[in-house]
Amino acid sequence: MIQQSFCQGPFLVSGLHGDQILGARDNQQDTFSILVGEDAFLLVLADGMGGYTGGELASRAAVEGFSKAFEREYLSPGERMKAAVAAANEQVLAVRKRGGKDDEMGTTLVAAWIGREGVCWVSVGDSPLLLIRNEKMFLLNELHQYSEELDRMADEGVISRDEALNHPARHFLTSALMGKEILLMDLREECFPLVPGDRLLVASDGVEPYLNSLGPAGMRYLSMLSAE
C-alpha cells in the first residue's frame, strides 16, 4: 500500500511517502499514519508482534491510540508525545484483553513530529528513525535491542566481539508496548534541527538489510522519493 500527501507551509515544502511491503509474511503487521497540519506534520509507525493476527491488531491499536491522543493534547510536542505513548500503550492493553490467545501481543512504535523548529521524536522498541543528509544515513533514535547490552559487554571484555555479533538473542527487544510498564522509551523533547535537503525515514526493523544492500546509489534514490 502506498499513500502520498503533500503540504506547503511558511517554512518548508515537503513530500511525504508511505509504503508497505509484505515480504515473506502472510499478513502485514506494520501500521503507519501521516497527520498533516498547517505548519507541521506527524509520522507514526508501529511494528506488531504476537501470533498470526496479534501483531497486526497491536500495531493498529497503537497507531490509532497515539494519533488520537496527540491531536487532543494542547501541550508542547514533547509533552504530547509522552502522553500519546501512554495512550497507545493503553490501547494495546485493551486489545490484548479482548485477544484471547493473542494476549501476549505487543508492538514497537516510533513517531516523529516535524515543524519549523526541526524534528522531535519518541520511540519504544527497535523501529528506526533515520536522517538522510548529503547522501549519508544517520540513526537518530535509540534502538531497544539486546544488542546494546551485548556490545557493552564486548567493550568491557566480558565476551568477545564475535560472540556479541553472533549471539542468538542479539535482536531481541528490551522494550515494547504491551499494555504493561514501558521499560525503555527514547523521547527527544528538544527538536533536532534540520537543514535544507534533509530527508527523514521512519521504518520497521525489517528495512535494515534492505538499506545495507543499497549503497550510495540507494541513498540517492531514497532522497529522490521525497524530493521537491
Language-model features: where?
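PP2C/PPM-type serine/threonine phosphatase catalytic domain
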Residues: 1-228
